[in-house]
């Protein structure tokens, strides 16, 4: 399908109007500079790719979101990171949020209300319950890091909470998913899943890891029944039908994370 030098893919979006048009957030190589990193677009089903969002040799893209009902409007999260033998550099001036108004062909950086210094990993979420709202969880300095909300399609932002995912570090998580029916409800992947029901003003732990594995990395919400959740963890896939009170595990899928 192409982009062999990207090594890590953060997100793939398929244009609902034309499945030959695909946008990719390419994180790029972890252990070296360069490679294929940033935002890419194909108009021929993956036969050829065009780099449309290029920042620098150490900054790739980790997240993409179409504006609900308007795939011409796209939001992208850029992430500067590099691993060395002696440590991991998570963040820098390259990280930030970008917006496209032409389906990912061109981009501009949005900054109003966002942290002004170096930023780390950023997760994005949108909701058809209110297409003007965009959420972002942003790794930054202790004073500026936190959960941000835009009410004007990403043009300006306000900090709602200082909470970001933790555990081994925000770079390990920073995935958020907004309810498709309630614009104030957002789930955040973390060691344990956290949820806000007031647009980020407060967060509470949804589950404690007693009925499922911790280390959550992906969350899906059923638009027809928002109490129905699918969660991807280091131990594989889990499903809940009661908004995270109880989970069942699917042990027959080869999707667990092994460590040595």
Where are these predicted regions, by residue range?
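Beta-propeller blade termini and top-face loops
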Residues: 1-260
């Amino acid at each position: 399908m192409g982009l062999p030098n990207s090594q890590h893919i953060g997100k793939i979006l398929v244009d609902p109007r034309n499945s030959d048009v695909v946008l990719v957030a390419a994180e790029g190589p972890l252990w070296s500079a360069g490679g294929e990193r940033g935002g890419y677009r194909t108009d021929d089903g993956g036969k050829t790719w065009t780099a449309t969002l290029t920042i620098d040799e150490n900054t790739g893209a980790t997240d993409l979101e179409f504006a609900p009902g308007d795939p011409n409007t796209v939001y992208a999260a850029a992430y500067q990171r590099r691993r060395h033998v002696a440590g991991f550099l998570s963040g820098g001036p390259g990280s930030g949020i970008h917006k496209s108004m032409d389906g990912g062909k061109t981009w501009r950086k949005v900054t109003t209300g966002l942290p002004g210094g170096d930023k780390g990993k950023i997760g994005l979420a949108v909701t058809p319950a209110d297409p003007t709202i965009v959420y972002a969880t942003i790794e930054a300095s202790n004073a500026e890091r936190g959960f941000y909300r835009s009410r004007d399609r990403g043009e300006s932002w306000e900090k709602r909470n200082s909470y970001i995912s933790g555990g081994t570090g925000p770079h390990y998580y920073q995935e958020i998913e907004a309810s498709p029916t309630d614009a104030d409800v957002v789930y955040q992947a973390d060691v344990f899943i956290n949820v806000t029901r007031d647009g980020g003003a407060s967060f509470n732990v949804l589950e404690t890891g007693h009925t499922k594995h911790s280390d959550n990395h992906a969350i899906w919400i059923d638009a027809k029944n928002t109490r129905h959740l699918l969660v991807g963890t280091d131990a594989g896939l889990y499903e809940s039908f009661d908004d995270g009170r109880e989970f069942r595990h699917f042990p027959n899928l080869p999707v667990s994370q092994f460590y040595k």
